[in-house]
């Protein structure tokens, strides 16, 4: 009956998916109203049935009484017979009366008999007037006529079984017929009392059996009808919910289609953008190639310029020769200039004529010069003769005067006194006569001499005039020569400038060409690495065969690294247990499943115990390592749901594994067992899956694409790279720049077999931050070409660092998630740098086990010539005030001119250069007490689509290996050191600073420095403050500012907590309350906040070791920290409660969410007396950890280091001497 009803509903009912919401609501309200009407009609008919039943019982009782009276009258009115008849006639009535209420105890049981109840009532009403033959058919006819009116028209289609409906309607008619026949038999006159008695008994028995049988059949039919009505109502409700579900499904499908179209549009736009980017990159490559060609052409032009430069040099030499000719022929040029002043401008012909004239004038000038020389010689001779004549004349005059004087003297002695007047006059006359007599020849000679003198004067005047003319000519020639010389110098200067410009341009072009060649080589190497360095996975996949009936898929917009994964859900076979659980032999089911990171897919609804879904999901995936790991190890859950109207519930679930799809490119068929919630098997689901394209080529294309993107990101080349750095100011002569270039690595092997590493290089130079290169994905021979520049001040500390230390270069694998692991490590010695030599070559890498693992090519060189600090010239001594002023001025100039010492410039990755710059200021005199510790944190980088994996080994490595005895434990270098500055003797402090190290082969090295001239007390205060606050842990390195008053080994001690591990059999490993632990120790007056590890680490697993790397430097100054020294002495001699050992306590630290107190887990003891006896520091010694209760059984080991041998010996010696004295 149910399938027929369902089929009828399917034909007449309109499709619910096409009905609107308003129509559905109207139909719902209409059905609700019809339901209320039917319910009211049902209660009315039930009340009517009750009334009819009471009337029927009364009529039955009255009919039997009438039959009994009639029988008594006919049998002669015997009281015995009448009593027997009455008792016999009422017996069936008494048995049937209580049965009738029992059959109608439930109101719902009479609901199917509603059409028959009025017919019974009408039969009883017409008992007395209607003949028996007609009474049997009237109820049946009326029941059939009223059957179609007992329910609303909507439910007519649900009544499909006419036979069952006729039986239900005919049963009351037969009952009425039996009752009328009984009445007819009662009305017949009995013939005899015994016969009537037997007939009554037979009739009562027969009627009771028949009534019992009829009542049973009626009850069964009523139950079936009730069940039928319930099923129809349930079917109607499920149809309604199914319609709602279909409507929702259509809405979801429409939304999914719109979202799919939108996503496809977005993917298309993204693909177009990628294509445009590729085109742009190609265009840029073409432009770069054009630039390279242009540079080559420029190089050819440069060669031409070199030829022209040589020609220009030859011209300069010719000009030098011409200059010499001009100096030799200045007279000719003078005359030519004088003659050319009255002539028009020179031409080529006039130039030749003038040259001829100049040559003639030069000849004339030579002749005149010869004549002038002869005249000058004659003039000199005549002057000499004239001088001789003058000497002769002067000598003659003197001789003549002498003779005259002699004569006068003689005359005076010969004359007498009386005759004195006469002789006095006589000599005068005599003298005149004497004078007159020789004057005549003398006058003649004088005339000759005067005549010769006049002639000589005339010739001398002429010569002087000629000489003045010559001098003027020479002066003019000098001026002309000066003009020519200035012009020549200007031309030479211009030529030199042009030559320098050409040389600078040539050098610039050479630099650009070298840079371009380097860039081309880098791109070639990277292209080779991308094209040939990406290995294929060892997957043996055959090419996909062509299927004729296969859906065509458009793969034009896909990338080479993408693939199409298909998952087909074929058919499910449900067991009888599943059908029983579903409660239906024809259940409506569908499947849901999700794959990778895509959305959940749903199959269509299918009806039947063996639903055939035939549904295929297609996923466009990118073949990478994550997807391969998913296919190899993951499985997807498939849920089987049963749909009931608008609701559904999960019937069973199964799992689909994808590992076999990697073995072939054909369809991989499989079956999943469907299990219920209780674990019972509900059936089997068949499916198949495949990859449309070979996975090996897709994975290789993905690795190539990823590697190319990494190279493109690393090869950002700024315009400033080609510019040559301008020379810095010469304020400080001891500044330099170190260039460290990581070129490439070769032959790297990953720790995972069959995989390629994603390497990057990391190193630290001097006091600078850690520098790391870019990450090259999936490459065994990465080409980095990473250049970092470190500006430094050449000090004694730097020189000692270069001579004693080596540059530790580490190569990490970004794909390796194990903490503390690296691919390779190498120590590059820096001694050649201290000798002003460069370092270049391939260095072999060794893994943590010590096995070789490839090589790294590095190049280190100086930007300028390196001079050791002792070779720098020292300025002269100055006064105290001048020195202080000069120091302040030089510090300010240094701040303005010299960049910070820890600044690094990365050439190939300028965008990341700022990540490793730490802001440092030069120390000022008034701010030395305000210095704080600088914390250098190691940051991680992210690459590709993964988050949190890229660069994660750096912090873990530095907490595991970098500080674990392989490199510098703590760096204490001075930022600003003025080693070449000599100040007055009162303010110069010569101290030594010890550089503390924790290495496997040696303990400490001493570095020299020349600090600033500041008060010793301030230095010591700052040193004590800095030493007490120096701590390191597993994630940080605390680097204090340099101490200006470094402590000696005998004035400090360093305690380091390295690592912690528990034994697997220890009770603490099973204690769930212990989740995090830290380590502490007590030392005299130090608070626990300074002697406990700053962070709590999770409890180590079995066989695992956790690293703290917490160090503490304790000041043991003999003057300021006497109590601490006394405390250590009491520990050594055994008077302290600690009994000569240092006690470490391992404490459990509860999680913040749990409000619990810390509890002590174990203790470790470090003996001090053996260190005092041996005189050696303890480096990473394992101490047994014992429990707080059982002090005999170790539960783990604690690795610590203690540098206090020198301090303990000094304290013991000092205290024993004090005790003895």
From Swiss-Prot:
<feature type="compositionally biased region" description="Polar residues">
    <location>
        <begin position="88"/>
        <end position="97"/>
    </location>
</feature>
<feature type="compositionally biased region" description="Polar residues">
    <location>
        <begin position="1"/>
        <end position="15"/>
    </location>
</feature>
<feature type="region of interest" description="Disordered">
    <location>
        <begin position="1"/>
        <end position="22"/>
    </location>
</feature>
<feature type="compositionally biased region" description="Basic and acidic residues">
    <location>
        <begin position="155"/>
        <end position="168"/>
    </location>
</feature>
<dbReference type="InterPro" id="IPR035892">
    <property type="entry name" value="C2_domain_sf"/>
</dbReference>
<feature type="domain" description="C2">
    <location>
        <begin position="723"/>
        <end position="843"/>
    </location>
</feature>
<dbReference type="Pfam" id="PF11618">
    <property type="entry name" value="C2-C2_1"/>
</dbReference>
<feature type="region of interest" description="Disordered">
    <location>
        <begin position="68"/>
        <end position="107"/>
    </location>
</feature>
<feature type="region of interest" description="Disordered">
    <location>
        <begin position="869"/>
        <end position="947"/>
    </location>
</feature>
<comment type="similarity">
    <text>Belongs to the RPGRIP1 family.</text>
</comment>
<feature type="region of interest" description="Interaction with RPGR">
    <location>
        <begin position="1027"/>
        <end position="1216"/>
    </location>
</feature>
<dbReference type="GO" id="GO:1905515">
    <property type="term" value="P:non-motile cilium assembly"/>
</dbReference>
<dbReference type="InterPro" id="IPR041091">
    <property type="entry name" value="RPGRIP1_C"/>
</dbReference>
<keyword id="KW-0175">Coiled coil</keyword>
<keyword id="KW-0966">Cell projection</keyword>
<feature type="compositionally biased region" description="Polar residues">
    <location>
        <begin position="903"/>
        <end position="914"/>
    </location>
</feature>
<keyword id="KW-0969">Cilium</keyword>
<feature type="coiled-coil region">
    <location>
        <begin position="267"/>
        <end position="533"/>
    </location>
</feature>
<dbReference type="InterPro" id="IPR031139">
    <property type="entry name" value="RPGRIP1_fam"/>
</dbReference>
<dbReference type="InterPro" id="IPR000008">
    <property type="entry name" value="C2_dom"/>
</dbReference>
<dbReference type="Pfam" id="PF00168">
    <property type="entry name" value="C2"/>
</dbReference>
<dbReference type="InterPro" id="IPR021656">
    <property type="entry name" value="C2-C2_1"/>
</dbReference>
<protein>
    <recommendedName>
        <fullName>X-linked retinitis pigmentosa GTPase regulator-interacting protein 1</fullName>
    </recommendedName>
</protein>
<feature type="region of interest" description="Disordered">
    <location>
        <begin position="119"/>
        <end position="196"/>
    </location>
</feature>
<dbReference type="GO" id="GO:0032391">
    <property type="term" value="C:photoreceptor connecting cilium"/>
</dbReference>
<dbReference type="Pfam" id="PF18111">
    <property type="entry name" value="RPGR1_C"/>
</dbReference>
<keyword id="KW-0844">Vision</keyword>
<feature type="compositionally biased region" description="Basic and acidic residues">
    <location>
        <begin position="134"/>
        <end position="147"/>
    </location>
</feature>
<comment type="function">
    <text>May function as scaffolding protein. Required for normal location of RPGR at the connecting cilium of photoreceptor cells. Required for normal disk morphogenesis and disk organization in the outer segment of photoreceptor cells and for survival of photoreceptor cells.</text>
</comment>
<dbReference type="GO" id="GO:0007601">
    <property type="term" value="P:visual perception"/>
</dbReference>
<comment type="subunit">
    <text>Forms homodimers and elongated homopolymers. Interacts with NPHP4. Interacts with NEK4. Interacts with RPGR. Interacts with SPATA7. Interacts with CEP290/NPHP6; mediating the association between RPGR and CEP290/NPHP6.</text>
</comment>
<keyword id="KW-0716">Sensory transduction</keyword>
């Amino acid at each position: 009956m149910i399938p027929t009803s369902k089929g009828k509903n399917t034909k007449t009912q309109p499709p619910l998916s096409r009905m609107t919401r308003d129509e559905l609501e109207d139909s719902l309200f209409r059905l609700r109203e019809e339901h209320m009407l039917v319910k009211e009609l049902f209660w009315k008919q039930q009340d009517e049935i009750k009334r009819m039943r009471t009337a029927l019982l009364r009529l039955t009782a009255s009919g039997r009484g009438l039959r009994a009276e009639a029988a008594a009258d006919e049998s002669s009115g015997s009281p015995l017979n009448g009593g027997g008849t009455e008792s016999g006639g009422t017996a069936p009535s008494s048995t049937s009366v209580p049965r009738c209420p029992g059959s109608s105890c439930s109101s719902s049981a009479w609901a199917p008999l509603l059409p028959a109840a009025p017919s019974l009532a009408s039969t009883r009403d017409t008992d007395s007037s209607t003949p028996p033959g007609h009474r049997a058919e009237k109820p049946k006819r009326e029941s059939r006529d009223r059957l179609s009116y007992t329910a609303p028209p909507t439910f007519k289609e649900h009544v499909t079984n006419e036979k069952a409906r006729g039986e239900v309607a005919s049963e009351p008619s037969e009952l009425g017929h039996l009752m009328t026949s009984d009445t007819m038999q009662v009305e017949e006159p009995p013939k005899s009392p015994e016969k009537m008695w037997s007939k009554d008994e037979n009739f009562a028995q027969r009627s009771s059996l028949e009534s019992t049988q009829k009542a049973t059949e009626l009850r069964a039919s009523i139950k079936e009808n009730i069940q039928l009505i319930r099923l129809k109502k349930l079917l109607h409700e499920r149809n309604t919910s199914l319609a709602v579900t279909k409507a929702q499904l259509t809405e979801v499908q429409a939304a999914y289609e719109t979202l799919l179209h939108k996503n496809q549009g977005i993917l298309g736009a993204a693909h177009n953008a990628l294509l445009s980017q590729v085109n742009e990159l190609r265009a840029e490559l073409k432009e770069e190639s054009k630039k390279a060609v242009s540079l080559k052409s420029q190089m050819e032009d440069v060669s031409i310029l070199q030829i022209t430069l040589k020609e220009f040099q030859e011209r300069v030499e010719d000009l030098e020769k011409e200059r010499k000719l001009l100096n030799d022929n200045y007279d000719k040029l003078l005359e030519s200039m004088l003659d050319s002043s009255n002539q028009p401008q020179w031409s080529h012909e006039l130039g030749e004529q003038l040259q001829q004239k100049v040559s003639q004038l030069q000849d004339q000038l030579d002749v005149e010069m010869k004549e002038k020389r002869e005249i000058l010689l004659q003039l000199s001779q005549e002057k000499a003769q004239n001088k001789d004549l003058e000497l002769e004349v002067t000598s003659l005059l003197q001789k003549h005067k002498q003779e005259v004087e002699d004569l006068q003297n003689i005359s005076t002695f010969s004359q007498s006194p009386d005759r004195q007047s006469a002789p006095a006059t006589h000599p005068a006359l005599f003298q005149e006569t004497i004078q007159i007599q020789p004057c005549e020849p003398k006058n003649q000679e004088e005339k000759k001499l005067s005549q010769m003198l006049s002639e000589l004067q005339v010739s001398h005047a002429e010569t002087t005039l000629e000489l003045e003319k010559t001098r003027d000519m020479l002066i003019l020639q000098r001026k002309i020569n000066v003009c020519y010389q200035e012009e020549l110098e200007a031309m030479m200067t211009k030529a030199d400038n042009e030559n320098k410009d050409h040389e600078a341009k040539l050098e610039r072009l050479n630099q650009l060409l070298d840079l371009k060649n380097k860039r081309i080589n880098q791109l070639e190497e990277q292209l080779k690495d991308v094209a040939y360095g990406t290995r294929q996975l060892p997957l043996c996949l055959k090419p996909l065969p062509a299927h004729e009936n296969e859906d065509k898929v458009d793969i034009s917009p896909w990338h080479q690294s993408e693939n199409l994964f298909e998952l087909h859900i074929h058919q499910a076979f449900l067991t009888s247990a599943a059908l029983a659980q579903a409660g239906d032999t024809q259940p409506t089911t569908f499947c849901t499943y999700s794959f990778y990171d895509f959305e959940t897919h749903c199959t269509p609804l299918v009806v039947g115990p063996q639903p055939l879904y035939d549904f295929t999901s297609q996923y466009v995936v990118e073949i990478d390592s994550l997807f391969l790991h998913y296919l190899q190890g993951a499985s997807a859950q498939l849920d089987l749901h049963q749909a009931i109207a608008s609701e559904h519930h999960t019937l069973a679930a199964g799992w689909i594994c994808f590992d076999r799809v990697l073995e072939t490119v054909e369809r991989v068929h499989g079956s999943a067992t469907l299990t219920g919630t209780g674990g019972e098997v509900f059936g089997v689901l068949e499916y198949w899956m495949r990859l449309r394209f070979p996975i090996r080529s897709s994975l290789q294309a993905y690795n190539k694409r990823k590697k190319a993107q990494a190279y493109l990101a690393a090869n950002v080349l700024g315009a400033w790279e080609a510019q040559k750095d301008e020379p810095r100011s010469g304020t400080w002569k001891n500044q330099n720049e170190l260039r460290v270039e990581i070129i490439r690595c070769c032959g790297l092997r990953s720790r995972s077999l069959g995989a390629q590493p994603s390497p990057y290089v990391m190193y630290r130079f001097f006091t600078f931050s850690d520098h790391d290169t870019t990450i090259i994905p999936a490459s065994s021979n990465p080409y980095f070409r990473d250049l970092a520049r470190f500006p430094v001040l050449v000090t004694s500390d730097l020189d000692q660092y270069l001579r004693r230390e080596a540059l530790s270069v580490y190569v990490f694998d970004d794909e390796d998630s194990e903490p503390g692991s690296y691919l390779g490590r190498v120590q590059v010695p820096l001694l050649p740098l201290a000798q002003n030599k460069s370092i270049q070559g391939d260095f072999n890498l060794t893994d943590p086990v010590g096995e070789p693992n490839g090589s790294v090519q590095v190049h280190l060189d100086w930007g300028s010539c390196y001079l050791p600090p002792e070779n720098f010239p020292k300025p002269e001594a100055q006064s105290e005030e001048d020195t202080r002023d000069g120091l302040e001025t030089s510090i300010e100039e240094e701040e303005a001119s010299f960049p910070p010492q820890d600044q690094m410039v990365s050439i190939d990755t300028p965008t990341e250069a700022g990540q490793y710059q730490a802001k440092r200021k030069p120390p000022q005199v008034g701010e030395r007490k305000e210095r704080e510790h600088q914390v250098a944190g190691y940051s991680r980088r992210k690459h590709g689509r993964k988050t949190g994996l890229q660069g994660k080994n750096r912090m873990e490595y530095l907490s595991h290996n970098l500080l674990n005895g392989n490199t510098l434990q703590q760096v204490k270098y001075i930022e600003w050191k003025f080693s070449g500055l000599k100040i007055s003797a009162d303010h110069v402090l010569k101290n030594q600073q010890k550089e503390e190290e924790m290495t496997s082969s040696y303990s400490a090295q001493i570095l020299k420095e020349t600090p600033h001239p500041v008060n010793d007390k301030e230095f010591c205060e700052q040193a004590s403050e800095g030493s007490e606050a120096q701590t390191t842990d597993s994630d940080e390195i605390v680097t204090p500012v340099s101490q200006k008053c470094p402590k000696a080994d005998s004035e400090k001690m360093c305690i380091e907590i390295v690592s912690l591990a528990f034994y697997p059999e220890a009770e603490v490993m099973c204690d769930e309350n212990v989740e995090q632990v830290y380590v502490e120790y007590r030392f005299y007056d130090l608070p626990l906040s300074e002697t406990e590890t700053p962070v709590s680490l999770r409890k180590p697993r079995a066989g695992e070791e956790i690293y703290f790397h917490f160090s503490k430097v304790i000041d043991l100054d003999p003057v300021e920290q006497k109590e601490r020294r006394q405390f250590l002495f009491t520990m050594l001699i055994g008077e302290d409660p600690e009994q000569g050992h240092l006690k470490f306590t391992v404490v459990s630290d509860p999680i913040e969410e749990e409000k619990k107190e810390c509890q002590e887990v174990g203790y470790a003891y470090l003996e001090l007396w053996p260190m005092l006896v041996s005189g050696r520091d303890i480096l990473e010694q394992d101490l047994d950890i014992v429990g707080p209760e059982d002090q005999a059984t170790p539960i783990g080991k604690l690795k610590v280091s203690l540098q206090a041998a020198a301090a303990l010996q000094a304290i013991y010696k000092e205290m024993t001497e004090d005790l003895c004295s």
